[in-house]
Design a protein with these regions (language model features):
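Short, well-ordered beta-strand elements
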Residues: 29-30, 90-93, 279-284, 291-296, ...
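Active-site Gly/Thr loop motif
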Residues: 252-276, 356-357, 361-396, 434, ...
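Generic recognition of flexible, low-complexity loop/linker segments
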Residues: 66-67, 192-194, 230-234, 259-262, ...
Length: 485
């Protein structure tokens, strides 16, 4: 079951909750919607493990949660704790920019990265989910995709957030720019009605093609893993890939078939720090997880518990610590395939102690300079403050946040995943008749090679983590930057 935020009420019999903590003995699933969580629980009831449940939930959420900035045209940060080996696994779920999307090309034609199709990246979510399913799951793609296919083909009830988000004036205007998008998301040229069944036949057809490819492979004697690969190939190398590329090109995008066909999601080791007896893991620096770890290192020097939960003093310290971490993020953090990220220095306790000296427990600062984790300096002496325009560009984005899911099975395996498709619904680009609503993650690139997030370096905005205590007690943590729970 999924545990929701709970509300305490004072009554004649003491304090009680209308939405109490939910306890499970054989597994738990938390997701962005009730149906997302139920999808994962159904997989656990059928004998699947935490990875099977997470993949199924993520596929279902990709159908039902475009208003939470997540579609099957997005990306995912995915961590898996293998209880038997007591090892945390990670997979790269962030797609790359097309090969023709160079700094010179953008500067020559636009002088910036325009919104829309020119700020997109190859979707990484399907690749990453199926890589994890193949390596650590037990089920087939068709089993994991059953609920998602059902929600796409037969529909799901339009819920309040879904209706309200689609119905905003700016989103409706952008959806109307694209006939395929308007046809799906604006039936009768208006937002879906509350409770009405929302059907996505094109998306169901795409998922069905993937299922059929797997079934054909299995029918020819292929292994479970080869069947999953066959399903993946439909999306990245087959007819669906070609139709997505054609749609992107028609929209003015810089994609070629090879941008999809050559994309892969490699496994990698996570990064981690300890915080007051807990070991906290995140994906590497293609996400912002490293900023969370730096923040925890800085905060470890304060007794937040003594200040009171969410007290002004405690919140002040957390906010200022985040600012310190973000300053280093802008200076040093990017795709480690292209940028020499000083992981050891950034994550060291010594460096955190140096950065902590800049924090005033009584006063807030608008921003901080980065430090120098290589030379162990609290402030980088070569730092030049950005212009006001650069600061505005660095903020960017849509403030609604994204979705999240967590699963744990009876064996103690667990998954923490943050799937996202930054700005997908806001830009409203459904790719032809595939039903895939495309991300706009590329808006986070810089057109300056001095920046660690320049165009060759995809940077994902989501951050999630998993933390373990003595590798026996477990929890998953999702950091939305305004509430830790």
């Amino acid at each position: 079951m999924a545990a929701a935020n709970y509300v305490h009420t004072q009554g004649s019999q003491g304090t009680y909750s209308h939405r109490p903590i939910v306890w499970g003995t054989r597994g738990m699933v938390g997701g962005g919607t009730q149906l997302t969580a139920q999808t994962g629980m159904r997989i656990l009831w059928q004998g699947g493990n935490a990875v099977d449940a997470a993949v199924a939930s993520a596929l279902a959420a990709g159908v039902m949660e475009p208003t939470a900035h997540y579609t099957l045209g997005g990306e995912v940060a995915f961590l898996f704790y293998d209880r038997s080996s007591k090892v945390v696994r990670s997979v790269v779920g962030q797609g790359w920019a097309p090969q023709r999307a160079t700094i010179d090309h953008y500067m020559e034609k636009w002088g910036e990265i325009p919104s829309g199709v020119l700020s997109t990246t190859v979707p990484g979510v399907i690749s990453a989910l199926l890589a994890m399913l193949s390596e650590y799951g037990t089920m087939s793609f068709s089993q994991a995709a059953e609920s998602a296919l059902n929600f796409a083909g037969k529909g799901f009830p339009s819920y309040q957030l879904f209706v309200r988000a689609i119905g905003t004036a700016d989103r409706m205007a952008n959806l109307r720019k694209h006939p395929e998008s308007a046809r799906i998301f604006l039936p009768n040229d208006r937002a879906p009605e509350l409770g009405s069944m929302f059907v996505q036949k094109d998306l169901a057809r795409t998922l069905s093609l993937m299922v059929q490819a797997e079934e054909q492979a299995l029918g020819q004697g292929a292994s479970r893993e080869a069947g999953i690969q066959a399903a993946r190939d439909v999306y990245y190398m087959g007819d669906v890939a070609r139709r997505m590329v054609k749609a992107l090109q028609d929209l003015g995008g810089l994609y070629d078939y090879e941008d999809f066909a050559e994309y892969e999601s490699p496994m990698e080791g996570p990064i981690s720090v300890t915080y007051r007896g807990y070991q906290v893991f995140t994906n590497r620096s293609w996400t912002q997880g490293i900023s969370l770890l730096q923040t925890l290192n800085i905060l470890e020097g304060f007794d937040l518990g003594a200040l009171g939960h969410n007290s002004p003093n405690a919140m002040h310290l957390q906010i200022e610590a985040l600012k310190l971490a973000f300053a280093d993020r802008e200076r040093y953090v990017g795709d480690p395939n292209f940028v020499d990220v000083p992981f050891d220095g950034l994550l060291s306790k010594e460096y955190a102690a140096l950065r902590r000296t800049l924090l005033d427990s009584d006063k807030a600062r608008a921003s901080y300079p980065p430090g120098d984790p290589r030379k162990m300096l609290a402030v980088d002496p070569s730092y030049v403050a950005p212009t006001r325009a650069e600061e505005a560009m660095a903020v960017g984005g849509d403030g609604d946040g994204t979705t999240y899911l967590a699963t744990v099975d009876s064996a103690g395996n667990m998954v923490s995943a943050t799937p996202s498709s930054f700005g997908a619904l806001a830009q409203g680009m459904v790719l032809g008749d595939t039903g895939i609503l495309m991300n706009c993650r590329g808006c986070y690139f810089w057109l300056d090679e001095e920046k660690s997030q320049f165009i060759a370096t995809p940077e994902a905005s989501q951050d999630h983590a998993m933390h373990l205590h003595n590798l026996e007690r477990w929890r998953t943590l999702y950091d939305t930057w305004n509430a830790w729970w």
